[in-house]
Amino acid sequence: MKIDMRNISKSFGTNKVLEKIDLELQSGQIHALMGENGAGKSTLMNILTGLFPASTGTIYIDGEERTFSNPQEAEEFGISFIHQEMNTWPEMTVLENLFLGREIKTTFGLLNQKLMRQKALEAFKRLGVTIPLDIPIGNLSVGQQQMIEIAKSLLNQLSILVMDEPTAALTDRETENLFRVIRSLKQEGVGIVYISHRMEEIFKITDFVTVMRDGVIVDTKETSLTNSDELVKKMVGRKLEDYYPEKHSEIGPVAFEVSNLCGDNFEDVSFYVRKGEILGFSGLMGAGRTEVMRTIFGIDKKKSGKVKIDNQEITITSPSQAIKQGIGFLTENRKDEGLILDFNIKDNMTLPSTKDFSKHGFFDEKTRTTFVQQLINRLYIKSGRPDLEVGNLSGGNQQKVVLAKWIGIAPKVLILDEPTRGVDVGAKREIYQLMNELADRGVPIVMVSSDLPEILGVSDRIMVMHEGRISGELSRKEADQEKVMQLATGGK
C-alpha cells in the first residue's frame, strides 16, 4: 500500500494546526514522525485514519482518492492507529477487548467463541507472544496491553500501523520485544508510522524520518543520512549542544543526607546532596532507584536507615510528613500520582500548599490566583489560564504544573523521578533551565532518569544503582556513557 497525503491543511476555528502538508507512506517501511508537542503529528494521523476530516487537501491510496469517515472504516481498509492512551476496558477479558465492536457471530446470531479464539491465537502467534484470553486486560502489564492493541489491528488485513509514543510506559525488555514485533511486521510488508521523541529509538528502528514544526513539514530523510543534532535543530531551531543549558550555581554544604537506607527491592543505600547541586541517579530498569525515592517520601515503608535535612535527622512515615519537612517529589507517573486531571491548573498547583492561603480562618483566593498566575508565567505554561483543566494540557505543560506544585512549597530538597519522560525537546530544555534556576537559589535536587544523555548533561554528580545497591559514584568530569553503563550492569 502506498499513501500520498497532498496539500493537507487543518484548522480548529481560527487555530490553524496543519498547513499544506505533503507526506508519503509505504508498506514495508518504518517511518518516524518527529516534532515538539503541538507540531501536528497526531492531528495528521487522525486525519489519515478518519477521526476528523482535513480542512483542505487530498489523500491518495495506491493512486486512488480516498477518505475515511471514522477510524473503523480505516481499520477495515488496513490502516490502524494505536494511540498513546490505549483504548482498552480494564474489567473486560482479553478476548472481549480484542473483538469489542467487531464480534464474530454464528448464523443463529450467537457469538462464535470458537472462531474468535482461533483468530486471537493466530494473531498472538504472529506476534510471538502468549497471553491468556480469559483474564481481565487490566491485570496485564502495559507492554502486554500494547501487544493486544497490535493483535487487534491484525484481525483485519493490516497494511499501515500508526503508533504514538509506543514505548513511553514500557520497560527496557518490553521495548525490545516491541521492536522485535515491529521488525517482524515490516518483514511481512506492513508499514509502520512511528511517532516518538526518543532519538535512540528513531535511529535503532526506523528507515525514514519526517520532522514537523508548527504544523508544517520541515524535512523528510532516510534515517541513516541524518543525526541527532540535525533533527533537534529542525524540530526546535537549536543545535544539540544548546540542548542542556549551562549551570552556574554555587554548590554549598551538604543539605540532604540518606544513610544505610533499606526497603523493598533495595538495601544499604547511602548518598548526600549539597545546596545548589543536581545529583543524578542512573541505573537500569528495576535497579531500585524509584523505590528509594518513594521510601524517602514516605509512600513506601522503610526497613531501616536514616534521613537528614540540614544535619537534623527526620522521621517520615507518610507523604504529608515529607511535605511538612520540605521534601518535594515529582513522581515518574504524573497522570496517576502527580496530577488530578479533572482539576484545574490552580487547584493542582496549590494542592500541597493550600494552608498557606488561609489566614485567621479565611481563604485568600485572590492571593492564591495571583501566586498561580506568577508560576504559569514563570514556567511558560501555554494556554495557562488558572481555571483550565490540567487534562487539556500537553505532556510538557502537565509536567510543568507538577513542578510548579512543588516549587510552591519552597522545598528544602526536590526529588525528580523521570522529569522529562514523554516531554518534547523544547519543553525538556525549559525544565532543565528551571532546575538550574532552582539550584541557583540553593535548592538541592535529586534527579532519577533513564535517559543517559540527560543524566550526563544535567547532573553535577552521578550515583549509579545495580540490583538494589549503589554500585558507584561519578563526578561530572569523569562520567561518560561507558562508565555509567559499566556500573549499571554490575561492573567496576
UniProtKB/Swiss-Prot annotation:
<feature type="binding site">
    <location>
        <begin position="35"/>
        <end position="42"/>
    </location>
    <ligand>
        <name>ATP</name>
    </ligand>
</feature>
<feature type="domain" description="ABC transporter 2">
    <location>
        <begin position="238"/>
        <end position="492"/>
    </location>
</feature>
<dbReference type="InterPro" id="IPR027417">
    <property type="entry name" value="P-loop_NTPase"/>
</dbReference>
<feature type="domain" description="ABC transporter 1">
    <location>
        <begin position="3"/>
        <end position="239"/>
    </location>
</feature>
<comment type="similarity">
    <text>Belongs to the ABC transporter superfamily. Ribose importer (TC 3.A.1.2.1) family.</text>
</comment>
<keyword id="KW-1003">Cell membrane</keyword>
<keyword id="KW-0067">ATP-binding</keyword>
<keyword id="KW-0762">Sugar transport</keyword>
<keyword id="KW-0547">Nucleotide-binding</keyword>
<dbReference type="GO" id="GO:0016887">
    <property type="term" value="F:ATP hydrolysis activity"/>
</dbReference>
<dbReference type="GO" id="GO:0015611">
    <property type="term" value="F:ABC-type D-ribose transporter activity"/>
</dbReference>
<keyword id="KW-1278">Translocase</keyword>
<dbReference type="GO" id="GO:0005886">
    <property type="term" value="C:plasma membrane"/>
</dbReference>
<protein>
    <recommendedName>
        <fullName>Ribose import ATP-binding protein RbsA</fullName>
        <ecNumber>7.5.2.7</ecNumber>
    </recommendedName>
</protein>
<dbReference type="InterPro" id="IPR003593">
    <property type="entry name" value="AAA+_ATPase"/>
</dbReference>
<keyword id="KW-0472">Membrane</keyword>
<dbReference type="InterPro" id="IPR017871">
    <property type="entry name" value="ABC_transporter-like_CS"/>
</dbReference>
<keyword id="KW-0677">Repeat</keyword>
<comment type="function">
    <text>Part of the ABC transporter complex RbsABC involved in ribose import. Responsible for energy coupling to the transport system.</text>
</comment>
<dbReference type="InterPro" id="IPR003439">
    <property type="entry name" value="ABC_transporter-like_ATP-bd"/>
</dbReference>
<dbReference type="InterPro" id="IPR050107">
    <property type="entry name" value="ABC_carbohydrate_import_ATPase"/>
</dbReference>
<keyword id="KW-0813">Transport</keyword>
<comment type="subunit">
    <text>The complex is composed of an ATP-binding protein (RbsA), two transmembrane proteins (RbsC) and a solute-binding protein (RbsB).</text>
</comment>
<dbReference type="Pfam" id="PF00005">
    <property type="entry name" value="ABC_tran"/>
</dbReference>
<dbReference type="GO" id="GO:0005524">
    <property type="term" value="F:ATP binding"/>
</dbReference>
